[in-house]
């Protein structure tokens, strides 16, 4: 989508007092730190929820640390932006291949970053090697398959699947999870997942590791894991642990 269209959506949503969120990227810039800069600028002074900030700090343009610090700086100077980040190394993306090319630019980027060709054979090898996992949901639990079983499942679905790569660097996850404003509030308002779609719901597991490390205390963990998200959604009876 062209950025001017996104700007119009943001303006209209704010006029209507509607919540608006953006998984950044446009026809001009991808889902990376450049796309993040673009989204912040497009919002102007309007409210905008920019989803999963850590996803734009994977070292595609600069290095992971510099990208995370830039994202934090932009959020500090634009309090109109609501944001969250997840704590898992896994991303979520489509693994569909058409005409020997993955249809998702995110998948293409992941394959290249991990040393695989962005082709049918490259995707197949990434799954076989365990660099990518194919999401299998049996109605009870979602899990990632790799190796021979993953390839067989992927091919049985004619590649029409989703899955994950381990492409979220620890440094950007850590920096964004713990960054604070001068008033002590968090730069990234909440921890997040995809609501169970992908097996990366590690808010408790990895969040408590931040507490154990000393980067957060238990009260701060509860604020990021529950309270801020509940407040943002207007859930008055939620937000405690």
Language-model features: locations:
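Histidine/acidic residue-rich metal-binding segments in metalloenzymes
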Residues: 1-159, 166-187
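Generic alpha-helical structural element
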Residues: 28, 164-165, 193-196
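His/Asp/Glu-enriched, well-ordered alpha-helical/loop segment
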Residues: 171-241
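Short, surface-exposed alpha-helical recognition segments that flank or form part
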Residues: 164-167, 217
């Amino acid at each position: 989508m062209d950025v001017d269209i996104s700007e119009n959506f943001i303006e209209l949503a704010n006029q209507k007092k509607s919540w608006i969120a953006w998984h950044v990227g446009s026809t001009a810039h991808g889902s990376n730190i450049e796309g993040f800069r673009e989204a912040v600028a497009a919002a102007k002074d309007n409210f905008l929820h920019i989803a999963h900030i850590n996803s734009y700090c994977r070292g595609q343009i600069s290095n992971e640390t510099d990208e995370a610090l830039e994202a934090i700086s932009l959020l500090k100077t634009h309090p109109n932006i609501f944001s969250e980040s997840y704590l898992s190394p896994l991303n979520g993306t489509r693994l569909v291949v058409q005409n020997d090319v993955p249809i998702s630019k995110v998948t293409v980027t992941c394959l290249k970053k991990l040393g695989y060709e962005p082709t049918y054979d490259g995707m197949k090898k990434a799954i076989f090697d365990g660099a990518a996992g194919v999401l299998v949901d049996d109605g009870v639990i979602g899990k990632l398959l790799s190796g021979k079983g993953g390839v067989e499942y992927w091919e049985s679905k004619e590649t029409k699947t989703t899955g994950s790569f381990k492409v979220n660097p620890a440094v950007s996850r850590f920096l964004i999870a713990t960054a604070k404003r001068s008033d002590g509030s968090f730069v990234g308002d909440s921890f997040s997942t995809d609501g169970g779609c992908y097996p990366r719901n590690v808010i408790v597991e990895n969040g408590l590791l931040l507490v154990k490390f000393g980067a957060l205390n238990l009260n701060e963990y509860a604020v990021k894991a529950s309270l801020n998200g509940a407040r943002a959604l207007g859930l008055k009876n939620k937000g405690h642990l």
